[in-house]
């Protein structure tokens, strides 16, 4: 995934575009030597290039979970992190968030992790994906718009990583690719523009770069009392939907957590 804190702000409102024909956001600088223009070698951020999933760069960890167990019966959570040094992705598949992936100053600076949880609501499976846009330190707030853009651009790659890394699950239960994907963007109260929930449609479509949101759909609500049609129960959900990581664990705070406390 592209670096989420080191690129300039994009000031215009936009919807992510995946056309490889777009011009670079940051043109190369030019310098003059002996009266001639000479182009310097300056890295250009690949913000508008195609988002491509490379299976060879994905490392998958199964942590205390049955690879073949249906997520409607056993909690199943994905924790995906990215290394800007190696350009590799690490995907942990477990019953709860793998907090060890979120530790360290670098991860706290970047906050480019994506966590997701399978949920069954009123008998229907859906994948709830969580992205941290702003809150925690000032750089995240300054680059909130750019971070939202990058997350939207890279999410199809993330979803492909989930499907590829959890291949045995999808081979055994191919119907899961028909499940709706709900994306929760978490942003501090002062930047509410990016504190929202979007439906990206069925997983098999959401993992494609041309997928769009389905604004006509409403987020399904779990039953308030114990039932058999919803899973996991509210008190066992590993993702209480937070805007910030406190002590390396997700904690519910104001914002989306207040609006949708049953996530």
Curated annotation (Swiss-Prot):
This is Non-functional protein STAY-GREEN, chloroplastic. Induction: Up-regulated during dark-induced senescence. Keywords: Chloroplast, Plastid, Transit peptide. It comes from the Eukaryota. Non-functional protein probably interfering with the disassembling mechanism of the intact light-harvesting complex of photosystem II (LHCII) in the thylakoid membranes. Responsible for a stay-green phenotype. Belongs to the staygreen family. It is found in: Plastid, Chloroplast. Residues 1-54 form a transit peptide. The keyword Transcription does not apply. Pfam families: Staygreen (PF12638). Signal peptide: none annotated. Corresponds to one of the seven genes studied by Gregor Mendel in 1866. The wild type line JI4 has a functional SGR protein (AC A7VLV1) lacking a two amino acids insertion. This protein is involved in the chlorophyll breakdown pathway. GO terms for cellular component: chloroplast. InterPro entries: Staygreen.
């Amino acid at each position: 995934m592209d670096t989420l804190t080191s690129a300039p702000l994009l000031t215009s409102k936009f919807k992510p575009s995946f056309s490889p024909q777009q011009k670079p956001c940051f043109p190369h600088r030019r310098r003059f030597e002996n009266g001639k223009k000479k182009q310097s070698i300056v890295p250009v951020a690949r913000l508008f290039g195609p988002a491509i999933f490379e299976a060879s760069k994905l490392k998958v960890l199964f942590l205390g979970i049955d690879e073949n167990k249906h997520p409607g019966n056993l909690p199943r959570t994905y924790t995906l992190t990215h290394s800007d040094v190696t350009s590799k992705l690490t995907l942990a598949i477990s019953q709860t968030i793998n907090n060890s992936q979120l530790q360290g100053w670098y991860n706290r600076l970047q906050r480019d992790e994506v966590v997701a949880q399978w949920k069954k609501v009123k008998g229907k499976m859906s994948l709830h994906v969580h992205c941290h846009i702003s809150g925690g330190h000032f750089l995240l707030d300054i680059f909130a718009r750019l971070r939202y853009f990058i997350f939207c651009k890279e999410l199809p790659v993330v979803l492909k990583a989930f499907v590829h890394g959890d291949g045995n699950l999808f081979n055994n239960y191919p119907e899961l690719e028909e499940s709706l994907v709900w994306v929760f963007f978490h942003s501090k109260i002062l930047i509410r523009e990016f504190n929202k929930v979007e439906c990206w449609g069925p997983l098999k479509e959401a993992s494609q770069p041309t997928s769009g949101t389905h604004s006509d759909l409403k987020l399904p609500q779990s039953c308030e009392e114990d039932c058999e049609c919803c899973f996991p129960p509210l008190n066992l959900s590993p993702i209480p939907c937070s805007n910030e990581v406190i002590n390396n664990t997700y904690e519910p705070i104001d914002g989306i957590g207040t609006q949708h406390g049953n996530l």
